[in-house]
């Protein structure tokens, strides 16, 4: 059985970890970084860039560079959040798919589902793991925000499938962080608050870590959050301030210039990071735009105090879910023994200060906020693979689940913060005399009114024998698996007839859609390989042309005019071939140049060897002088000093 890798698929950055023996290890990507930007770009040449390479070219390719895709995953286009919070904040096109989902489109009109874009990031993670392990990787544990609903969880599983990964478990991010902390800590019973403020989402989980018969039992008592609160919002607040200040100075609104907007966005993110350690920073963007009077430059000084005033409402927004999580767990602030900070945005001093004020204790600084979630996912992978024996994880469902009943009311079968996996049944009946069928409308949320909650799906139980209203007994069963994904069945107790629905297409993608996307991903992998091979052939050709011409120059009169002409002709033909996309032609002309140059190289080598032999013979006659020999001191260098 291969390794089950752990992936933190983040809004802004993603991270990969694996179990290395008994410990989880974060794996660096091909660029040598421990986290990878969750950015995917489609270039004019048809190449797909992922991570740092995609982020670097975002300024010049804003329409086709997709970031913060996690905020769209599993969402409908008409969602208030999509219309208000996303469409206005990104330079790329967000469109309505045929099934009503929020999709994205390139400027060339290629439409893509968010899981399809996220799959590119997962493919890079998969490749990183395979390069490190030297073997194929097909299984993963992927983390999601604790407050993700069923559709968002399913869409994340779909992204894994498109990337060629079987998602063995979907695990909540704060739970994963507690797992990373809990496995390392051997301090007996603890009640831990995990405050997770990432790039796009915020979660708070209250978790109990206990030693039960020598096993680390990690039980989630409650969870709460906001799927539209994260570092991206902090960047945006600073970006809007910079644009407003520039408008005051120059009278030009940069909101309408996509290129300038992307430059300001990047500068805002950089300034935000700098202000976590410095009291002030300069945002300097020369030639940001131009008008009739000439080019304009943006140069604005931002102090930490100014930035904190811009985002203080965002930080305060995170404290309300903290109150609710404590209430749901039936605990007070004094019951919390440790506070863990997770997510890059928790590096901001104001966040740390407000969390300390709220819980009345100093948050721990020994947990890496960028890596803890991936480490926890890898540990869960180790548990599932049987490599980690002494850990028991008890997670919860973040939102209540139920069905619509008479009068448009939601009747809850499973309350929020119920430990999963779980199964619950309840008997319902008909609303009319001789009603032949009932529609089971499955809902997720906390509101009394059915229409105010998230609809997960509908199905009908038909052929109910004629009977007065209230007589037939329809047993509805909700079954949630360990991923937090739901199965619902309805059974007529009189006839035994049963109908069920696996809430699996609530991500909006059918099996056929996913299969097509898997094939597209494989085709892209093939195209990427062809592109890579073509570039390699061109590089080989360029090196050969350079070395051949240099050698001819160095050999001078030792090469005849006819030989020089033959080599130059072969070089020119190869140069012409490298300008095409025909790999075979490049390789054929490369071979032709190699063959043309081979006799010259042999002749030069023979002459060189002959000259060296003659020189060596002359030197052999000279006696060696003893004083030329020096004794050197050698020192053993231990591995840890290397």
Curated annotation (Swiss-Prot):
Keywords recorded for this protein, A-Z: ATP-binding, Chaperone, Nucleotide-binding, Phosphoprotein, Stress response
Induction record: By stress conditions e.g. heat shock.
Residues making up the signal peptide according to the UniProt record: none
InterPro entries, alphabetized: ATPase_NBD (IPR043129), Chaperone_DnaK (IPR012725), Heat_shock_70_CS (IPR018181), HSP70_C_sf (IPR029048), HSP70_peptide-bd_sf (IPR029047), Hsp_70_fam (IPR013126)
An annotated Gene Ontology molecular function: unfolded protein binding
Record PROSITE patterns: HSP70_1, HSP70_2, HSP70_3
UniProt feature, compositional bias: Acidic residues: 628-642
Record-listed Phosphothreonine modification sites: 201
Pfam name, any one: HSP70
Chain coiled-coil ranges: none
Region (Disordered): 609-642
Origin superkingdom: Bacteria
CDD domains, per database record: ASKHA_NBD_HSP70_DnaK-like (cd10234)
Function as written in the Swiss-Prot or TrEMBL entry: Acts as a chaperone.
Classification via PANTHER family: HEAT SHOCK PROTEIN 70KDA
Family, as annotated: Belongs to the heat shock protein 70 family.
Protein name according to UniProt: Chaperone protein DnaK
Native organism: Francisella tularensis subsp. novicida (strain U112)
Gene that this sequence comes from: dnaK
């Amino acid at each position: 059985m291969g390794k089950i890798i752990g992936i933190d698929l983040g809004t802004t950055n993603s991270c990969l970890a694996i179990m290395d023996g008994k410990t989880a290890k974060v794996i660096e990507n091909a660029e040598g970084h421990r986290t990878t930007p969750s950015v995917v770009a489609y270039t004019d040449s048809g190449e797909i860039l992922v991570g740092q390479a995609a982020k670097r070219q975002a300024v010049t390719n804003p329409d086709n560079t997709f970031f913060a895709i996690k905020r769209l995953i599993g969402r409908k286009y008409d969602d208030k959040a999509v219309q208000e919070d996303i469409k206005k904040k990104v330079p790329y096109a967000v469109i309505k798919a045929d099934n009503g989902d929020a999709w994205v489109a390139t400027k060339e009109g290629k439409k893509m589902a968010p899981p399809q874009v996220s799959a590119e990031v997962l493919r890079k993670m998969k490749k990183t793991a395979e390069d490190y392990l030297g073997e194929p990787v097909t299984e993963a544990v992927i983390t999601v925000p604790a407050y993700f609903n069923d559709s968002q969880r399913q869409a994340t599983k779909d992204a894994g499938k498109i990337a060629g990964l079987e998602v063995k478990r979907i695990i909540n991010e704060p739970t994963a962080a507690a797992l990373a902390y809990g496995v390392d800590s051997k301090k007996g019973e603890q009640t831990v608050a995990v405050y997770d403020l990432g790039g796009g989402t915020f979660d708070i989980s209250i978790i109990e870590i206990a030693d039960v018969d020598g096993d680390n039992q990690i039980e989630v008592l409650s969870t709460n959050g906001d799927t539209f609160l994260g570092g991206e919002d902090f960047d945006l607040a600073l970006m809007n301030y910079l644009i407003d200040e520039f408008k005051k100075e120059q009278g030009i609104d940069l909101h309408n210039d996509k290129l300038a907007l992307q430059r300001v966005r990047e500068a805002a993110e950089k300034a935000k990071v700098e202000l976590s350690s410095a009291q002030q920073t300069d945002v300097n963007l020369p030639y940001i735009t131009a008008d009739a009077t000439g080019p304009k430059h943006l140069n604005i000084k931002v102090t930490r105090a100014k930035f904190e005033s811009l985002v203080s409402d965002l930080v305060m927004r995170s404290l309300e879910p903290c109150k609710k999580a404590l209430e749901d767990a039936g605990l007070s602030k004094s019951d919390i023994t440790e506070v863990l900070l997770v997510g890059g945005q928790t590096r901001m001093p104001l966040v740390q200060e407000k969390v300390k004020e709220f819980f009345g204790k100093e948050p721990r600084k020994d947990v890496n906020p960028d890596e803890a979630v991936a480490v926890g996912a890898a540990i869960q992978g180790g548990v599932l693979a049987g490599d980690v024996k002494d850990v028991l994880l008890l997670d919860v469902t973040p939102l209540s689940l139920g069905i619509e009943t008479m009068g448009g009311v939601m009747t809850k079968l499973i309350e929020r913060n119920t430990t999963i996996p779980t199964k619950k049944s309840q008997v319902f009946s008909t609303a009319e005399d001789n009603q032949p069928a009932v529609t089971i409308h499955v809902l997720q949320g906390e509101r009394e009114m059915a229409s105010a909650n998230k609809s997960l799906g509908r199905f009908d139980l038909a052929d109910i024998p004629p009977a007065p209203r209230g007589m037939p007994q329809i047993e509805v069963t909700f079954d949630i698996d360990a991923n937090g994904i739901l199965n619902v069945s309805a059974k007529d107790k009189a006839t035994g007839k049963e109908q069920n629905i696996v809430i699996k297409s609530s991500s909006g993608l059918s099996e056929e859609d996913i299969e097509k996307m898997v094939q597209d991903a494989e085709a892209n992998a093939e195209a990427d390989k062809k592109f890579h091979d073509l570039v390699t052939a061109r590089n080989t050709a360029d090196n050969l042309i350079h070395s051949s011409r240099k050698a001819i120059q160095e050999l001078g009169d030792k090469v005849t005019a006819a030989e020089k002409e033959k080599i130059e002709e072969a070089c020119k033909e190869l140069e012409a071939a490298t300008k095409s996309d025909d790999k075979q032609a490049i390789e054929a002309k490369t071979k032709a140049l190699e063959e043309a140059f081979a006799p010259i190289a042999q002749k030069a080598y023979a002459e060189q060897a002959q000259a060296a032999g003659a020189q060596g013979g002359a030197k052999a006659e000279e006696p060696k002088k003893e004083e030329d020999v020096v004794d050197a001191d050698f020192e053993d260098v231990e591995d840890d000093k290397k």
